[in-house]
UniProtKB/Swiss-Prot annotation:
Keywords associated with the record: 4Fe-4S, Amino-acid biosynthesis, Cysteine biosynthesis, Heme, Iron, Iron-sulfur, Metal-binding, NADP, Oxidoreductase
Gene3D superfamilies on file: Sulfite Reductase Hemoprotein, domain 1
Enzyme class: oxidoreductase
GO biological process: cysteine biosynthetic process; hydrogen sulfide biosynthetic process; sulfate assimilation
Source species of the chain: Citrobacter koseri (strain ATCC BAA-895 / CDC 4225-83 / SGSC4696)
Keyword field contains Heme: yes
Its job: Component of the sulfite reductase complex that catalyzes the 6-electron reduction of sulfite to sulfide. This is one of several activities required for the biosynthesis of L-cysteine from sulfate.
Protein's name in the database: Sulfite reductase [NADPH] hemoprotein beta-component
Encoding gene per record: cysI
Cofactor: siroheme; [4Fe-4S] cluster
GO terms under cellular component: sulfite reductase complex (NADPH)
Length: 570
């Protein structure tokens, strides 16, 4: 994209303060251990507020009661979000029972939140329960290491591919990549698991003493499903199979969706194709991409620090050549691949060995016992009898995987009795939101709490126009950081202020095109009025099989984003 304007390999200038914090942290220890014992505050102070992110936690507070507590001269009700490391979203039923118990007994909200990065989060962990949550995870073979901040985050892997044999191989690679790129510091084990300090000096051969310039996200994807939304990620391994066996990967680098309102130096970007590599080079290439970004990423401006900006600054070919040099390989030409969809296949799907997979739609990924729909209890009951595993999907749903024919009826009965298989519209299945209020400190507008009733209204429009059995990929994100992946939707809403959103149009169903802003800072009635008109036109004027996003581009309603570094804001 940007070979015309190659810039410096390293950005000189005053380093961002986060770089000082990492350097002085003694490999991510800081004074977290001492801070844990400070009962005068429910939060972590100073650098520790940011350092705990490397340990998989964010400090939050309940924004619904923030003003009320301030009036009472009380500090905000601090509580932690904890995000588990769960490559490929695979979790055993024993592990599920442990996290269910912890959520019920030791969190403010009592829920498990499935995320669109294939893991789960606990919201509302008080400071006194922070150490116990890490110890509980460790006791069942899990951890929260490197699920936030400037590291390689949770590695995604296609959940329910059409060829299940490939899933086992791809999942193993997702785990290997995750383990290979983990930090080597013993800080996590010392602070949370009470393991002894070792006399040897810490070293970080891959990540370095100041870790990465910014967050880094990786996927393993099995076409034709793009359920993991590869273009939202820094590094993507697209599976290439021959005769049903995995033989290598196409590598795509430099995707990312977060922007800052009004900051023209920020933009969403799809990933660039680097080439094909045989399986045996996977870890060397993963390491080479990460270390190139480690050394060349912008450490002076965190808003321009992600891999997508490094690629645009130095040029795709320059970055690719450096990866080849470090990995000691030459990429082969990209092998053919195509995507046909990215939604989950809700309901039963037959896999190999006569085993079945049941994908359950979980609205917003929020697992809780609702009136008449005790979802959390239902999943616990299934976990008690299911001998296979659960898989969390990148669409915030849950798969009961590996069900033998003999257990199928029993598991389906439990699911139906607990409201886990209630019929929902295609539109609802293809709509998604991030958490946003009340817990996210960055939220500008509602997302998770807004989505269910908003989808009711979109469903009414779809019915009115005679397309109630069809869908538009709809995403709502509460702020421009973009966790809801609205920047890969056919209709994307990006929070601007309470009750107000920027409306983006022109993405496509398979998630390979960035949508452009259509209207700025508008209310729900204004959004619905626009959609009413546009859905009406789509139904009347579309070509056979043409999705809503493709139609808005072809009809000239919105110009496609072709080169985001230059035309995203036009």
């Amino acid at each position: 994209m940007s070979e015309k304007h190659p810039g410096p390999l390293v950005v000189e200038g005053k380093l961002a303060d986060a770089e000082r914090m990492k350097l002085e942290s003694n490999y991510l220890r800081g004074t977290i251990a001492e801070d844990l014992n400070d009962g005068l505050t429910g939060g972590f102070k100073g650098d520790n507020f940011l350092l705990i992110r490397f340990h998989g936690m964010y400090q939050q507070d309940d924004r619904d009661i923030r003003a009320e507590r301030a009036e009472q001269k009380l500090e905000p009700r601090h509580a932690m979000l904890l995000r588990c490391r769960l490559p490929g979203g695979v979790i055993t039923t024993r592990q599920w029972q442990a996290i269910d118990k912890f959520a019920a007994e030791n969190t403010i909200y009592g829920s498990i939140r499935l995320t669109n990065r294939q893991t789960f989060q606990f919201h509302g962990i008080l400071k006194k329960n922070v150490k116990p949550v890490h110890q509980m995870l460790h006791s069942v073979g899990l951890d929260a290491l490197a699920t936030a901040n400037d590291m390689n985050r949770n590695v995604l892997c296609t959940s329910n591919p059409y060829e299940s044999e490939l899933h086992a191989e791809a999942y193993e690679w997702a785990k290997k990549i995750s383990e290979h790129l983990l930090p080597r510091t013993r800080a996590y084990a010392e602070i949370w698991l009470d393991q002894e300090k070792v006399a040897t000096t810490d070293e970080e051969p891959i990540l370095g003493q100041t870790y990465l310039p910014r967050k880094f996200k990786t996927t393993v994807v099995i076409p034709p499903q793009n359920d993991i939304d590869l273009h939202a990620n820094d590094m993507n391994f697209v599976a290439v199979a021959e005769n049903g066996k995995l033989v290598g990967f196409n590598l795509l680098v430099g995707g990312g969706l977060s922007i800052e309102h009004g900051n023209k130096k920020t933009y969403a970007r799809t990933a660039s194709e680097f080439g094909y590599l045989p399986l045996e080079h996977t870890l060397a290439v993963a390491e080479a991409v990460v270390t190139t970004q480690r050394d060349w990423g912008n450490r002076t401006d965190r808003k321009n620090a992600k891999t997508k900006y490094t690629l645009e600054r130095v040029g795709v070919e320059t970055f690719k050549a450096e990866v080849e040099r470090r990995a000691g390989i030459k990429f082969e030409p990209i092998r053919p691949y195509e995507f046909t969809g990215r939604g989950d296949r809700i309901g039963w799907v037959k896999g190999i060995d006569n085993k079945w997979h049941l994908t359950l739609f979980i609205e917003n990924g929020r697992i809780l016992d609702y009136p008449g729909r005790p979802l959390k209890t239902g999943l616990l009951e299934i976990a008690k009898i299911h001998k296979g595993e659960f898989r969390i999907t990148a669409n915030q749903n849950l798969i009961i995987a590996g069900v033998p024919e003999s257990q199928k009826a029993k598991i389906e009965k439990l699911a139906r009795n607990h409201g886990l298989m209630n019929a929902v519209t295609s539109q609802r299945e293809n709509s998604m939101a991030c958490v946003s209020f009340p817990t996210c400190p960055l939220a500008m507008a509602e997302a998770e709490r807004f989505l269910p009733t908003f989808v009711d209204k979109v469903d009414a429009l779809m019915t009115h126009h005679g397309v109630s059995d069809e869908h538009i990929v709809l995403r709502v994100t509460g702020c421009p950081n973009g966790c809801g992946r609205a920047m890969l939707a056919e209709v994307g809403l990006v929070g601007k202020a309470p009750g107000r959103y920027n409306l983006h149009l022109g993405g496509n169903r398979i998630g390979t095109r960035i949508p452009r802003m259509f209207k700025e800072n508008i209310t729900e009635p204004e959004i619905l009025a626009s959609l009413d008109e546009l859905i009406g036109r789509w139904v009347k004027e579309r070509e056979a099989g043409e999705g809503f996003g493709d139609f808005t581009v072809r009809a000239g309603i919105i110009r496609p984003v072709l080169d985001p570094a230059r035309d995203f804001w036009e």
